[in-house]
């Protein structure tokens, strides 16, 4: 798994940051909390299609992402998805294909972006956490960096075809670490996920 920024990744990263700063007055608060080396999970809220690049450009390291397998069929951008560390999700076997891919990345010392809520909000409010991120934490022992993106829902909610020019701020909280006892057993998955989501909810501008 690619842990460093390749030419194409760095190009996408640089363009995303330039666009975010130009059109959304993009800023990051708490960037010093991001784990820049070794296994890590970046855990932002999910309000918009813009969230993956907004979260990724807050980091100074290569991040791995989940995306629908169909996105790889997009003209121009599709072939670049693997260069941007996109792990395709097969809708017919989403849980296994996605989660196992992410676990391999993290165990190899990489960083992955996981949305605790699992899907985009419909109304801009935070949603309950799903157990997926808790399972990944339990399987890998990786620390979790809570992150909250303010403004992405107002800029590009589900029902819009084009984004609005709205200020966007990313707030990063201190990493969360879970010991072996906290990660033991299936009932731990949801508890870990809930703790991560509580940390995300507690972040303020």
Where are each of the predicted segments found?
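Conserved beta-strand scaffold positions in the cores of enzyme catalytic domains, especially
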Residues: 28, 65, 86-88, 144, ...
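Generic beta-structure capping elements
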Residues: 31, 45, 68, 92, ...
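Catalytic core of membrane glycerolipid acyltransferases/transacylases, capturing the structured
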Residues: 8-14, 21-22, 34-93, 101
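Non-catalytic C-terminal accessory region of glycerolipid acyltransferases
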Residues: 2-11, 97-205
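Conserved functional loop/turn residues at catalytic and ligand-binding sites
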Residues: 27, 45-46, 85, 109, ...
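Short gly/ser/thr-rich secondary-structure transition/capping motifs
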Residues: 21-29, 93, 152-155
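A short beta-turn/loop motif at secondary-structure boundaries
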Residues: 32-35, 162-163
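A residue-level signal for beta-strand positions that form part of recognition/binding surfaces
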Residues: 25, 39, 167-169
């Amino acid at each position: 798994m690619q842990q460093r920024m390749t030419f194409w990744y760095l190009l996408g990263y640089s363009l995303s940051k330039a666009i975010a700063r130009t059109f959304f007055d993009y800023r990051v608060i708490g960037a010093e909390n991001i784990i820049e080396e070794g296994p890590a999970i970046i855990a932002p809220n999910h309000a918009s299609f813009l969230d993956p690049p907004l979260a990724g450009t807050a980091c100074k390291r290569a991040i791995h992402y989940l995306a629908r397998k169909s996105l790889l069929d997009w003209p121009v951008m599709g072939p670049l998805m693997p260069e941007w560390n996109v792990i395709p999700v097969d809708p017919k076997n989403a849980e296994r294909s996605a989660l196992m891919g992410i676990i391999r990345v993290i165990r190899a010392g990489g960083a992955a972006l996981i949305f605790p809520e699992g899907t985009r909000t419909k109304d801009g409010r935070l949603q309950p956490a799903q157990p997926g991120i808790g399972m990944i934490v339990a399987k890998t022992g990786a620390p979790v960096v809570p992150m909250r993106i303010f403004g992405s829902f107002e800029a590009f909610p589900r029902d819009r075809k084009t984004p609005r020019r709205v200020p966007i701020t990313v707030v990063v909280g201190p990493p969360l670490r879970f010991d072996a006892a906290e990660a033991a057993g299936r009932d731990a998955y949801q508890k870990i996920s809930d703790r991560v989501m509580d940390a995300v909810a507690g972040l303020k501008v």
